[in-house]
């Protein structure tokens, strides 16, 4: 059953786009020039107690445990990372929420370009305060390990009106070819023509064998000159993931030790503060399937330098109440 969690982690890594140098520099400049009003944010809900919302009284569902999963756009084993330059960005972000009483799992996806408050640091690690910027670059102001994950945990919690987050798990790009080769590759039918001009072998309708050598270009490539190009590749990612799940399930059925070995193969590319007991609980709950999948509401727009996802804060508060709270009167 570890297979389900591993494949969730793989899904997070399928996000892309890497503008570390330009975006972190721009964020630092904005942080240096902001005033105290820019640093305030009023949440409509909280992570504990009761709240009054649109005429009703709600209580946070304290049976929930929420875990942050991140896909990182950098390479190499994480134990080699030392500074901000090594960290990369959290280009795929979602929260897995488990109800310990009902063993139900819900998933909330957070678009990588969501504009929100992040904490900015200079290269020596000194905080420059908060700035409104893409949530995915919050990871870049850490060390690529626990510090980066903790920063993302805080940023995501703040975006979600103080939602408590009990743990995190991230995996970087090098995990994609490793896990693809470990299952022996997968065969896919190219779902669209989004790669055809750049990689003719990926013509729409073509049947292609995906291996560790070509997996990344199939799932991650996008034309960064086109607005909202991160959304275009989603169908390819879905196709890859479905094929990967099927192949991994076949392998797991043939070999009882396959899943444990698969996890060992990607450990060098992951960062987590979640113990085996937490994964075991998630795995048990995952047997019931995912009961709800949501995306932070908003609209993609072209920013001055990069794509932006403008979060609809009112709709987000509605979603937070419906996913994480219970009405008591």
Could you tell me what each predicted segment is?
Residues 3-15:
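Hydrophobic membrane-insertion alpha-helices, especially the h-region
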Residues 15-329:
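Non-catalytic, solvent-exposed segments at the cell envelope interface
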């Amino acid at each position: 059953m570890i297979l389900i969690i591993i494949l969730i982690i793989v899904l997070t890594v399928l996000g892309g786009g890497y503008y570390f140098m330009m975006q972190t520099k721009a964020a630092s400049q904005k942080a240096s020039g902001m005033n105290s009003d820019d640093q305030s944010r009023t949440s409509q809900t909280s992570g504990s107690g009761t709240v009054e919302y649109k005429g009703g009284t709600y209580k946070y569902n304290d049976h929930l445990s929420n875990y942050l999963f991140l896909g990182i756009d950098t390479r190499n084993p994480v134990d080699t990372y030392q500074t901000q330059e090594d960290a990369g960005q959290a280009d795929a972000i979602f929260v897995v929420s488990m109800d310990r009483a009902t063993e139900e799992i819900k998933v909330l996806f957070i678009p990588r370009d969501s504009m929100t408050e992040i904490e900015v640091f200079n290269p020596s690690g000194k905080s420059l305060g908060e700035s409104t910027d893409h949530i995915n670059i919050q990871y870049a102001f850490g060390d690529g390990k626990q510090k980066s994950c903790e920063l993302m945990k805080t940023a995501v919690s703040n975006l979600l009106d103080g939602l408590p987050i009990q743990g995190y798990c991230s995996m970087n790009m090098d995990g994609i070819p490793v896990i693809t080769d470990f299952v022996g590759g997968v065969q896919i039918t190219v779902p669209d023509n989004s790669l055809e001009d750049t990689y003719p072998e990926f013509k729409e309708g073509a049947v292609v064998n995906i291996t560790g050598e070509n997996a990344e270009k199939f799932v991650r490539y996008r034309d960064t000159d086109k607005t909202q190009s991160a959304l275009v590749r989603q169908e390819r990612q879905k196709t890859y993931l479905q094929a990967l799940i099927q192949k991994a399930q076949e392998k797991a059925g043939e070999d009882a030790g396959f899943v444990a070995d698969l996890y060992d193969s990607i450990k060098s590319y992951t960062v987590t503060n979640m113990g085996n007991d937490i994964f075991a609980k998630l795995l048990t709950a995952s047997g019931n399937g995912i009961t709800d999948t949501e995306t932070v509401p908003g609209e993609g727009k072209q920013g001055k330098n990069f794509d932006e996802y403008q979060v609809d804060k009112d709709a987000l508060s509605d979603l937070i109440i419906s996913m994480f709270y219970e009405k008591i009167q």
